[in-house]
């Protein structure tokens, strides 16, 4: 598996130059360059709290979820609520958002402080994912939902229409698999919680009686539990890396 792409330390790139680059890559003409700059600024930069991307990320996450849910609702009229939820989660998770950040080339435009180099691969992936969501919020505030929808469709539409069957929720899958191994249940435990309050990282361990435990990380307890469940499903051969079960 490829290691997460490192982020550069903060560098001086003019707001106009940044906007020009992103206008070409997003198809959107940015009206508020100060807000765009904020969307690209990590909290490690020594600046007032409102000068980083965190508030924009909050809004962009909601706009992305709504727009992708709408795309899936229209594209899969026969899909159940459960299948739509699985597809939605796969399309808005950190891995997908970070991959789109790489397509856009955002890593070279994100402003970070020197301490960003101490973050592990998972946290760096999360930074790139966060900036994509902040960028969505910037587009939304510039041009409304239609402008945000246009950008999201540009990068998410093809992914949303992939014909492969949606993979089931990892915790549900592990629960059923564990039951088949002798009527046992997975047990999840939080091993640690690190990072600031606004950007925590949870380390969770899952155990199934008779099997070695597995660990997973995530920005919430739920995501970390899913990550741990996925790790065990892959290790035990229940899931394959090609997406088959």
UniProtKB/Swiss-Prot annotation:
Residues 19-144 form the RNase III domain. PROSITE patterns: DS_RBD (PS50137), RNASE_3_1 (PS00517), RNASE_3_2 (PS50142). The keyword Cytoplasm applies. Its cofactor is Mg(2+). CDD domains: DSRM_RNAse_III_family, RIBOc. One of its GO terms (cellular component) is cytoplasm. It comes from the Bacteria. Mg(2+) binds at residues 57, 130, 133. Belongs to the ribonuclease III family. Homodimer. This is Ribonuclease 3.
